[in-house]
From Swiss-Prot:
Its EC number is 3.1.21.10. Keywords: Cytoplasm, DNA damage, DNA recombination, DNA repair, DNA-binding, Endonuclease, Hydrolase, Magnesium, Metal-binding, Nuclease. InterPro entries: RNaseH-like_sf, RNaseH_sf, X-over_junc_endoDNase_Mg_BS, X-over_junc_endoDNase_RuvC. Homodimer which binds Holliday junction (HJ) DNA. The HJ becomes 2-fold symmetrical on binding to RuvC with unstacked arms; it has a different conformation from HJ DNA in complex with RuvA. In the full resolvosome a probable DNA-RuvA(4)-RuvB(12)-RuvC(2) complex forms which resolves the HJ. This is Crossover junction endodeoxyribonuclease RuvC. It comes from Shewanella woodyi (strain ATCC 51908 / MS32). The gene is ruvC. The lineage of its organism: Bacteria, Pseudomonadati, Pseudomonadota, Gammaproteobacteria, Alteromonadales. GO terms for molecular function: crossover junction DNA endonuclease activity; DNA binding; magnesium ion binding. Binds 2 Mg(2+) ion per subunit. GO terms for cellular component: cytoplasm; Holliday junction resolvase complex.
Amino acid sequence: MAIILGIDPGSRITGYGVIQCNGRSQIYLGSGCIRTASDDFPYRLKQIFDGVSEIIRQYQPNFFAIERVFLAKNADSALKLGQARGAAIVAATNADLPVAEYSATQIKSAVVGTGKAEKTQVQHMVQQILKLPAAPQADAADALGVAICHFHTSQSLVSLGGRANTRTYGRYR
């Protein structure tokens, strides 16, 4: 039995989702959003750190998974998103949690089956996979998707005996 905390980072809204994994089943434990209230950016980072730390204290997860930064058109937005991720990751490392990072494409592929899925498709599939009565809010659904992605990735590694295929075909690019 393992508990996975998934994080969808944002400088204004950071989504979180917590699932428990028993064998091949995934059980919903909780989800929501950390909403930062201040215009003072360093204080918003503190709110993210404190919020993630509290969620870790509340749910006692074994694993922490977070979405990787994507390339944004606006460099300032990308930097702020990276700093928000950093605040969440520091909260996880303070609790001695192993940190896993996944791209948006990996997360969408694990949850929906295609890396080009829309947000509404992710919400719908998260609802179906976790047997929720209603679709979660977009940021919380994305965070639950991160946790589901980590579950599927770790299950794949277990079935491979903890190692990937070492043969490589073709050229490295």
